[in-house]
Amino acid sequence: ILAHGAGAPMDSPFMVAFAEGLAATGLCVGRFEFPYMQTRRATGSKRPPDRAPKLQEAWAEVIAAVRNTMPKDGRLIIGGKSMGGRIASLVADDQAADGLVCLGYPFHPLGKPEKTRTEHLAGLKAPTLIVQGTRDTMGNQDAVSGYTLSKKIRLHWLEDGDHSFKPRKKSGRTEEQNWSEGITEVAGFLNKI
């Protein structure tokens, strides 16, 4: 199950590319929108995300609904883009997720590197993959190397990628290449856990 980031809905190009790319590898992939994004879509008015407890509650409801429909031997992997992945990381252990995938984890708010969102990551028990751009303004490679993270967390760095994995032209890479590499990494990770 993939959750969107704070500003873009579940049908943003990023979310579509990852959901369809992972489905093409044989994985069953679902997406959902948090209530604030559903309201934004229905009314057309921009709304900020709800506070973390309400977002965690939404995740728990989605997980319960999915568990009611999946085979007993099915594995439940949760995650998402930026905020969606962060909130998934907050509920993964309590919800007994079989794995966690974070795409562009917001290690700190934009422009506030001193306000880290990493404390819970040190004790995370769910097998976790974080796919991150090396230039991500919410946690670049240099900054993240100094954080204490659980041994269950594996990081994969996308060369010259920003928060949405877009590289600079001078890097010689394209956004599509980084997305494709990210999809391949996620699929490989999920096949190993």
Segments the model singles out, each with a brief description of its role:
Residues 80-84, 88:
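Gly/Ala-rich beta-loop-alpha elbow adjacent to hydrolase catalytic centers
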Residues 145, 149-193:
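C-terminal catalytic histidine-bearing segment of alpha/beta-hydrolase fold enzymes
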Residues 2-74, 92, 162-175:
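Serine-hydrolase catalytic machinery in alpha/beta-hydrolase-like enzymes
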Residues 123-125, 130-132, 136:
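Short beta-strand/loop motif that positions the catalytic acidic residue
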Residues 34-35, 102-110, 133:
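Active-site nucleophile loop of the alpha/beta-hydrolase fold
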Residues 87-91, 111:
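Hydrolases whose catalytic domains are alpha/beta-hydrolase-1, hotdog thioesterase
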Residues 137-143:
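Conserved alpha/beta-hydrolase "acid-adjacent" motif
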